[in-house]
Amino acid sequence: MKAFCAFCVVLLVFGSVSEAKFDDFEDEEDIVEYDDNDFAEFEDVVEDSVTESPQRVINTEDDEDEATVELEGQDEGQEGDFEDADTQEGDTESEPYDDEEFEGYEDKPDTSSNKNKDPITIVDVPAHLQNSWESYYLEILMVTGLLAYIMNYIIGKNKNSRLAQAWFNSHRELLESNFTLVGDDGTNKEATSTGKLNQENEHIYNLWCSGRVCCEGMLIQLRFLKRQDLLNVLARMMRPVSDQVQIKVTMNDEDMDTYVFAVGTRKALLRLQKEMQDLSEFCSDKPKSGAKYGLPDSLAILSEMGEVTEGMMDTKMVHFLTHYADKIESVHFSDQFSGPKIMQEEGQPLKLPDTKRTLLFTFNVPGSGNTYPKDMEALLPLMNMVIYSIDKAKKFRLNREGKQKADKNRARVEENFLKLTHVQRQEAAQSRREEKKRAEKERIMNEEDPEKQRRLEEAALRREQKKLEKKQMKMKQIKVKAM
């Protein structure tokens, strides 16, 4: 009963409210105005929601996904209540864009996305990865060394060229007065005088002279230090050496007698005795002092026989050797000159090397490496010594006993050589015979005609039998002579 009474009270209240509402509108115009105002209120609500939505997304501390879901829910509710929602959206899109509506939107940072990111940490760059000169010290050293090598190459090459030209200028007049041809480079078929040095490389210069009595020619070689090589320059700081001038005179066979003779520093003679074939065979004794002939203690003598020493050490030669002893490395006269010893892997050569009658001179340039162009002029008296030695070698002749002794020495050297090479020569002859037999057998086997092949075999057997018979006859003759 109580419930029924409560229900009746609710109905009465609802009816009174609705009646009061419709009493306010007396005519149809008021109803239309109410309807328009009613929709206007909802339009204000939509516009307020659009303008307030960015602030809600920015200021809220919740996730962006949740805020977006709430806004979409509100829009769907509004579309369900109003049938002309699409028309209103078209009107709002046609309205001009108002910049004041979004004022301050970009000024507020979006802190929601930063919360999910890790904090930024700044790592210190190691010192060896920084862009500083200390990081390129190795490259700097390499570039500096390369520049130093290039500069030393240019300076050293130019200095050697100046020294060579200074030597040639000071000796040119003397050479042209004694030789018809000075400076032939060998490029032309006919010998022509170029009047200049021939550069072999950066530290070696050659000069060929010919056209003089009693000699075929003279080769002058200026062997300077490798000043263009930086490593060689550094090595010379520890062990100084000198520039050298080497002169080789090839004599005519009829203008020089048979003897081997050398004079020079003791150290140089010992080295030559080990390296040169003729000095090691014909001058096997140790170098002897030249004090007997008035030579300084720094010089020694190697000679095949005493007669040669007596004949070569005249007053003028002793004068040259005494006054220029500091510049003389060695003086070597030989009719058996064949160069350095021949070293073969399979043993001794099967024949004696070819020999030439030769005069060799080796002079040291003053300065011990610190040479200047003016020092090259100091070698001019030594060139006079070379010219005098050529004439001296032509005039000097051994007596009868000396000639016989020289011939015995050469026969002894040849006999020793044949003994050393006898086994090798036998092996070489045996290998040649075997090769010949092998070729003969191959020729017989390759013959297609059986009859011709048989005849070739019979001929080979007959030759073998003849050889055996000859050997037996020789053995019988030897036995008869022995009896």
Swiss-Prot record:
Cellular compartment(s): Endoplasmic reticulum membrane; Rough endoplasmic reticulum membrane
Signal peptide residues on this chain, from the entry's feature table: 1-20
Membrane topology qualifier: Single-pass type I membrane protein
InterPro entries attached to this UniProt entry: CCDC47
Transmembrane segments: 136-156
Glycosylated sites: 178
Keyword Ion transport attributed: no
GO CC annotations on file: endoplasmic reticulum; endoplasmic reticulum membrane; multi-pass translocon complex; protein folding chaperone complex; rough endoplasmic reticulum; rough endoplasmic reticulum membrane
Bias (Acidic residues) ranges: 60-104
Top-level taxon in the UniProt lineage: Eukaryota
Region annotated Disordered, chain positions: 46-119, 424-483
Claim: rRNA-binding is one of the keywords in the record: no
Keywords per UniProt: Chaperone, Coiled coil, Endoplasmic reticulum, Glycoprotein, Membrane, Signal, Transmembrane, Transmembrane helix
Composition-biased stretches (Basic and acidic residues): 105-118, 430-472
Coiled coil: 450-483
Pfam families: CCDC47 (PF07946)
Compositionally biased residues, Basic residues: 473-483
GO MF, one annotated term: ribosome binding
Function: Component of the multi-pass translocon (MPT) complex that mediates insertion of multi-pass membrane proteins into the lipid bilayer of membranes. The MPT complex takes over after the SEC61 complex: following membrane insertion of the first few transmembrane segments of proteins by the SEC61 complex, the MPT complex occludes the lateral gate of the SEC61 complex to promote insertion of subsequent transmembrane regions.
Subunit structure comment from the entry: Component of the PAT complex, composed of WDR83OS/Asterix and CCDC47. The PAT complex is part of the multi-pass translocon (MPT) complex, composed of three subcomplexes, the GEL complex (composed of RAB5IF/OPTI and TMCO1), the BOS complex (composed of NCLN/Nicalin, NOMO1 and TMEM147) and the PAT complex (composed of WDR83OS/Asterix and CCDC47). The MPT complex associates with the SEC61 complex. Interacts with VCP, HSPA5, DERL1, DERL2 and SELENOS.
Family recorded in the similarity comment: Belongs to the CCDC47 family.
Protein name: PAT complex subunit CCDC47
